[in-house]
């Protein structure tokens, strides 16, 4: 058994695989009626699995971000950096995939490291709904976790919060 959300980046559902005779025994359990998934969950899980099989990463943001090249991540970070008024530096980094299926897996990434008190910056960014991390005593935003369509809004939020603080 495994979790569809953790393994596939899909809907929250438990999946049981195994021998036909063992699955048949599970089906006869009265708890099955209470624990079975609905049609919407099955439809969404089916869509995720089809995207995997067809390598259609655009349909699943998690897959898109995992499969993005380091160069593409760097370009997103540079695009944001040129418009952000707050002083920041582009740095090479590693993104931790995490989750139950790949807790220690890392992917090459690029971050913008912001100059200043890392903990104070982290708190101000979180109030804006922007989640980063502290790495080597700097507050950083990891651009492997930023979608292309989010960059402009991210820049607007940062510039709005830190007016005149370049």
Model-derived features with residue positions:
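Short secondary-structure junctions and interdomain/linker hinges
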Residues: 33, 52-56, 87, 128-132, ...
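Charge-rich, low-aromatic oligomerization/scaffolding segments with amphipathic character
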Residues: 150-157
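Generic C-terminal helix-cap and adjacent flexible tail
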Residues: 160-166
């Amino acid at each position: 058994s495994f979790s569809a959300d953790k393994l596939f980046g899909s809907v929250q559902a438990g999946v049981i695989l195994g021998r036909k005779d063992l699955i048949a025994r599970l089906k006869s359990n009265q708890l099955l009626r209470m624990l079975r998934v609905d049609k919407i969950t099955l439809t969404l899980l089916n869509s995720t699995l089809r995207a995997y099989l067809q390598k259609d990463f655009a349909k699943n943001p998690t897959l898109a971000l995992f499969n993005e090249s380091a160069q593409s991540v760097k370009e997103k970070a540079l695009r944001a950096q040129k418009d952000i008024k707050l002083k920041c530096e582009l740095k090479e980094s590693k993104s931790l995939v995490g989750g139950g299926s790949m807790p220690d897996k890392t992917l090459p990434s690029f971050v913008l490291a912001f100059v200043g008190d890392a903990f104070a910056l982290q708190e101000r960014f979180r109030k804006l709904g922007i989640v980063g991390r502290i790495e080597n005593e700097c507050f950083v935003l990891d651009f492997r976790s930023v979608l292309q369509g989010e960059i402009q809004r991210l820049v607007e939020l940062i510039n709005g919060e830190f007016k005149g603080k370049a």
